[in-house]
């Protein structure tokens, strides 16, 4: 179906199982007339929507849909070169979908720009998602499982957290329970909470992203995840840089390498839990922290472990400049092995490497005295100045 240039005021359209709907980008305008929903598709075989401007006019959407464009079940979905504006809920709400969303501009959604749940081979690439109320791009599952969505080359900007909370909302890219997701080459700026937040996402890759001016932790891998590769990202401006945490919930197994983290703040969107905001990189279990550069982290450059939740962490070959404490490592009873070696630490105001009992520093500078009798620590060949 080809829509010539013009304005089309419509409501409550049920899309057929096979449809190619196309128009002239910016000139073929579908305007939501209200009183229910705009586009709803269920159990589609092949659905393509290309070259359309879709305007929700911030009108009310019924409880039977989650977004201005709602697709529940699609063997092959293509949304390409569209503009989707002013949704009263999510802009795109996708459930059990395979296919691709690409080269589209999405803005002004009351909730998230793109919400995907239970995907099976979805690619979200080359889009601009901006000025949304509660999230940018969401990749979720109802239960933990393989998802394999690719989120690449998108611009995500100015994402708010109108629903409040301490992390579920206000994230540029949010992965929840979805395994095997790749998040690469995105530019994410001015999000109320995280640029990229993965909660329970196994085998996630977060690579080559630019994360600017995040309100809370810029890159988060948290809760019951197993497997995270976080590399070659730039974080400039955040309350915390990169957090790979929640060993107490089963979070473990990660590589954090070749990231640049700078210009952190001790002010966040809510009163901080101990030890506070202003940490460059945090890791807890079965993790290698290697070859990163951290500058201007007012609390800690690196934070290794929390209480007894420390196991098999290496911190080697990192450069840390202008931190409160260069590296803070747990020395609580029950903490597991950590190797801290071959790091350069410059301008750490409260010591280059300090052992901590939770938030309290309890050792001298280990860069000068070695492991201070803590058998679980190896501290060697670090250069502090």
Segments from the language model and where they lie:
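Extracellular beta-strand-rich solenoid/capping regions of secreted or surface-exposed proteins
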Residues: 8-22, 30-76, 91-97, 142, ...
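Parallel beta-helix/beta-solenoid
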Residues: 16-18, 25, 43-44, 49, ...
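Short glycine/acidic-rich loop motifs that flank beta-strands on beta-rich extracellular proteins
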Residues: 10-12, 25-26, 31-38, 58-64, ...
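Extracellular beta-strand repeat scaffolds in secreted/surface proteins
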Residues: 1, 22-23
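Acidic Gly/Asp/Thr-rich repetitive segments characteristic of extracellular carbohydrate-active
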Residues: 1-4, 9
């Amino acid at each position: 179906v080809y829509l010539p240039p013009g304005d089309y005021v419509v409501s409550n359209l049920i899309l057929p199982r096979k449809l190619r709907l196309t128009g002239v980008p910016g000139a073929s305008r579908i305007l939501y007339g209200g009183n229910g929903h705009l586009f709803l598709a269920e159990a589609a075989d092949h659905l393509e929507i290309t070259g359309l401007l879709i305007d929700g006019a911030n009108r009310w959407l019924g409880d039977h849909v989650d977004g201005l464009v709602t697709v529940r079940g699609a063997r092959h979905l293509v949304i390409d070169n569209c503009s989707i504006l002013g949704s009263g809920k999510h802009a795109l709400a996708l459930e059990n979908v395979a296919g691709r969303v690409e080269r589209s501009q999405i803005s002004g959604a009351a909730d998230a720009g793109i919400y995907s749940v239970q995907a099976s081979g979805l690619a979200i690439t080359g889009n601009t998602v901006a000025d949304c109320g509660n999230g940018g791009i969401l990749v979720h599952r109802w239960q933990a499982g393989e998802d394999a969505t690719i989120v690449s080359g998108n611009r995500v900007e100015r994402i708010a957290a109108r629903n409040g909370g301490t992390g579920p909302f206000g994230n540029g890219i949010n992965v929840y329970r979805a395994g095997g997701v790749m998040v690469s080459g995105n530019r994410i700026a001015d999000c109320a909470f995280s640029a990229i937040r993965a909660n329970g996402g196994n085998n996630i890759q977060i690579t080559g992203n630019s994360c600017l001016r995040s309100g809370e932790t810029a890159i988060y891998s948290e809760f019951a995840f197993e497997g995270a590769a976080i590399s070659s990202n730039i974080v400039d401006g955040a309350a915390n840089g990169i957090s790979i945490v929640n060993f107490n919930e089963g979070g473990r197994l990660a590589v954090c390498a070749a990231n640049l983290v700078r210009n952190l703040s001790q002010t966040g969107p809510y009163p901080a839990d101990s030890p506070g905001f202003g940490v460059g990189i945090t890791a807890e279990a079965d993790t290698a922290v290697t070859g990163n550069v951290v500058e201007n982290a007012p609390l800690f450059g690196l934070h290794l472990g929390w209480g007894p939740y420390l196991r098999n962490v290496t911190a080697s070959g990192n450069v840390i400049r202008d931190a409160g404490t260069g590296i803070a490592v747990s020395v609580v009873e029950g903490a597991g092995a950590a190797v801290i070696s071959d790091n350069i630490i410059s301008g750490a105001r409260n010591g280059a490497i300090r052992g901590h009992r939770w938030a309290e520093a309890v050792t001298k500078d280990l860069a000068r005295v070695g492991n201070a009798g803590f058998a679980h620590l190896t501290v060697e060949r670090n250069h502090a100045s």
